[in-house]
A protein has these predicted regions:
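Non-catalytic cap/lid and distal C-terminal segments of serine-dependent acyl enzymes
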Residues: 1-139
Length: 139
């Protein structure tokens, strides 16, 4: 697994809950070191957060000015608009399995591969539109 800090990486994660593979993006800050523990932001619709929102640049700026503590970003991109309906919508056919993937499998992957704080208040879920509703509904 590539832990080069300061760039967005992609890794494939097998989900037994969803019976499929997810390409997950992650960003380690330029100052990343396994010697420190990090908060985690999990973004849904992550390709939009990285490409248009440049979330990694914002996090770097906020860390530098000490407005936030050390943070890594992990994101789940959506392959299509139709996919979002099935996974993010509470009535979607894959919604419950996706909640299980995020809660158990994705969080386990994050904690097993990165130096993270393992407390509920050290995690943030975020998304836009339907992904934002999903984030709020899984808290």
């Amino acid at each position: 697994m590539d832990k080069t800090p300061g760039k967005v990486h992609t890794v494939s994660i097998e989900s037994s809950a969803c019976n499929e593979t997810f390409d997950v993006q992650y960003y380690l800050p330029k100052s990343y070191s396994d010697l420190y523990k990090y908060n985690v932001i999990i973004t849904f619709d992550s390709q939009d957060f990285f490409k248009y929102g440049q979330i990694e640049r914002l996090i770097e700026k906020l860390e530098k000015t000490e407005e936030i503590q050390r943070t890594i970003i992990v994101g789940v991109p959506y392959p299509s608009v139709e996919w979002r309906k099935h996974y993010f919508n509470p009535n979607g056919e894959h919604h419950e399995n996706f909640v299980t993937f995020v809660g158990r499998e994705l969080n386990s992957f994050i904690d097993n591969n990165f130096s993270t704080l393992k407390m509920a208040n050290s995690r943030l879920l975020m998304g836009e539109s339907l992904a934002g509703s999903f984030s709020l509904s899984t808290v």
